């Protein structure tokens, strides 16, 4: 936990337990439910490695369901682990931000677990801009109208309550609320989630065109499953 007066940051992954039938069901078909769970586990492992590489921040996972703690303790034994609290995604985001701010962190960045090809540079940029005076909110927009990252310098529950989650209206509504609250907003580059069959093919194509081993767990899964 940060000492009094010390500026500290935390990057936490919003994650689900990689259980068959509970994750990535929109990828079935082309995947089976077991394959979808294995793919999501690969996404998680890659995101954990990516977040762990951020030396300027503490690292956490907000997990669901509550009984999944042992799974995440095995996947990321060095991470802060907390259960997600609340009904919809908005309430869970509010509770997760509240938990970390209560722990004394200066800024909190929450990232999704559906963007295995997201460049680490984007997360480094988020840590840079959240530390700048005048930045209250950092958003990493997703192509589907949501966001892959949201960061705050103080709890702002009004940003998340009553938002039409899982629709293309999430980002516009969040932006409108931030403007109404007078918040200074910093933007990251747009990126894509992997939720559907076409998304998976796009991921496969983008990784095939990209040099380097990362994201290594996702690459291993895709290499073992011909397209």
Regions found by a protein language model. Give the residues of each.
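N-terminal nucleotide-binding beta1-loop-alpha1 segment
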Residues: 1-26
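Conserved alpha/beta core of the MobA/IspD/sugar-nucleotide pyrophosphorylase nucleotidyltransferase superfamily
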Residues: 2, 173-227
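A short, N-terminal amphipathic alpha-helix
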Residues: 38-57
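Short beta-strand/loop segment that forms part of the nucleotide-sugar
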Residues: 56-65
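Short phosphate-binding loop-to-helix
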Residues: 71-108, 167
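Catalytic metal- and UDP-sugar-binding loop of GT-A-like glycosyltransferases, i.e.
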Residues: 111
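Short, glycine-/small-residue-rich phosphate/pyrophosphate-handling segment
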Residues: 157-175
């Amino acid at each position: 936990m940060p000492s009094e007066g010390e500026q500290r940051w935390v990057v936490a992954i919003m994650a689900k337990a990689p259980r068959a039938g509970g994750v990535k069901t929109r990828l079935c078909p082309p995947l089976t439910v077991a394959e979808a769970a294995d793919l999501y586990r690969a996404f998680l492992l890659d995101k954990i490695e990516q977040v762990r590489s951020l030396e300027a921040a503490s690292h956490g996972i907000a997990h669901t369901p509550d009984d999944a703690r042992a799974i995440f303790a095995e996947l990321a034994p060095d991470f802060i682990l907390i259960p997600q609290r609340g009904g919809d995604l908005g309430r869970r985001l509010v509770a997760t931000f509240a938990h970390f701010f209560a722990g004394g962190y200066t800024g909190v960045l929450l990232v999704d677990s559906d963007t295995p090809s997201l460049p680490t540079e984007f997360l480094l940029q988020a840590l840079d801009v959240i530390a700048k005076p005048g930045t209250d909110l950092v958003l990493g927009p997703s192509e589907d109208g949501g966001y892959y990252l949201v960061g705050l310098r103080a709890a702002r529950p009004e940003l998340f309550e009553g938002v039409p989650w899982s629709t293309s209206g999430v980002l516009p509504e969040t932006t409108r609320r931030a403007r109404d609250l007078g918040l200074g907003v910093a933007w990251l580059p747009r990126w894509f989630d992997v939720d559907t069959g076409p998304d998976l093919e796009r991921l496969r194509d983008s990784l095939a065109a990209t040099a380097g081993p990362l994201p290594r767990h996702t690459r291993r899964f895709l290499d073992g499953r011909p397209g």
